[in-house]
């Protein structure tokens, strides 16, 4: 980044800080904002601090009105953010250097498994920014490691399905394994420019770099290295015998940054790729492929986890080599979902080592998007929680209670109410003044016109939960009448609702015997799956698989399957 661009950035941050703090900006705050948005500048922090001090002094000498005017005119996105903050609006902060209509972002999953809550964060955040700036969104499958991160053929479509369910759409789609010739072309150009070379020292090459030395081929000219690269492509080297390295600093304090590997040989006869089989032997590493594609696809902003900060430094080496302008890099903290496993490797291990115990990648005990969907969590709830967390650099843990609260608020407006009893007790009905009574119960309190009619007559049987059917207790059957529990009989007392209110009677759910549906409730509790048996009212038969319901006084559930008249539902939350 040139000095003029740097000074302009510092001026924007200083104006924003001054407007936020009554006309006074501080060097510390300005540097924090700059390095948070541009971690690649951290190595120049000492040099930049003196420039920041001059810019802050300049801004602090301005009248407050002038500060606001300059911020609004020259940095409208930063000004908009301050306006949102003053109003208390929640939302994502502005992107540095963003121009409406020219922002382009990407979500780039590895299709070695389905996506989980942690992966959903960059997908949703990038998509939201693309919408905010009327920009474009790219979906890019990063599948260039068939050896250690073997792609799954089915994962491509499963990821697409999960993204669509989350409301994430994209304008362009790419699969890196289908772009191999592009990577070869850029590798050749990097070698021609003298900033990449073929290390054919095998295992010794890595050992040399660990001592701050290097393979002698580093000192060869571009022509010789290009010849070696063509031999790699033609299969004259075996896996592990030769790699292409970016020329960085063989004595860099961080060994992983010393002439890192850009291309390597993978024996695809042993490790075939699910899309291209054994067509290619030489494969780009993650950092090389990402750098090339982010440039070729004109990505303006890269938003990803802070675990990629070291990768950012590696990728900048490619940009410097090729003379490309890098995108803006923004790193946010890791995201955890309390009580759920998000690790792909751990989930795969559980599925492999404990077959038959879990339902698959979409088991409701897992934090995969498919698992949360199967549990009954709505996409809107996930999106809402992730946007609230935003792009903060600190790690964040979402509690299940918070996600459930967001989901409950949405479900409460949508889910029909169904009566369900667990651990049932059969009771006989004895009405006092009439032979029969009819209950008209709305499926949803806000839509009273949709209701079911259930008629009970003297001698009919009903099912109550054991904890409600306490001897001598008075209670009200929902929508019907008031009763006393007496030796297996429900004896009607005053039928009025006023009586129930005056006596503060519990209003309980009930199921008429004879039309009941068998229900199995699966309750996920961390890695345990508790099973409960009960009965639901006949009205449940109007709902199919994937219906979200509220079992009255029990909780929200999602219908997972209906087999032989038995409804299997998954307990979502209270």
Curated annotation (Swiss-Prot):
Motif 'HIGH' region, residue range(s) on this chain: 109-119
A GO molecular-function annotation: ATP binding
Record-linked PANTHER family: GLUTAMATE--TRNA LIGASE, GLUTAMINE-TRNA LIGASE
Keyword terms, alphabetized: Aminoacyl-tRNA synthetase, ATP-binding, Cytoplasm, Ligase, Nucleotide-binding, Protein biosynthesis
Reaction equation(s) it catalyzes: tRNA(Glu) + L-glutamate + ATP = L-glutamyl-tRNA(Glu) + AMP + diphosphate
Disulphide bonds in the chain: none
Annotated gene: gltX
Record EC number: 6.1.1.17
Protein name: Glutamate--tRNA ligase
InterPro entries, alphabetized: Gln/Glu-tRNA_Ligase, Glu-tRNA-synth_arc/euk, Glu/Gln-tRNA-synth, Glu/Gln-tRNA-synth_Ib_cat-dom, Glu/Gln-tRNA-synth_Ib_codon-bd, Rbsml_bL25/Gln-tRNA_synth_N, Ribosomal_bL25/Gln-tRNA_synth, Rossmann-like_a/b/a_fold
Gene3D superfamilies for this protein: 2.40.240.100, HUPs (3.40.50.620), Ribosomal Protein L25, Chain P (2.40.240.10)
Source taxonomy: Archaea, Thermoproteota, Thermoprotei, Desulfurococcales, Desulfurococcaceae
Compartments where located: Cytoplasm
Family designation: Belongs to the class-I aminoacyl-tRNA synthetase family. Glutamate--tRNA ligase type 2 subfamily.
Main location: cytoplasm
GO cellular component, one term: cytosol
Keyword flag Nucleotide-binding: yes
Enzyme class label: ligase
Superkingdom assignment: Archaea
GO biological process, any: glutamyl-tRNA aminoacylation
Cited function: Catalyzes the attachment of glutamate to tRNA(Glu) in a two-step reaction: glutamate is first activated by ATP to form Glu-AMP and then transferred to the acceptor end of tRNA(Glu).
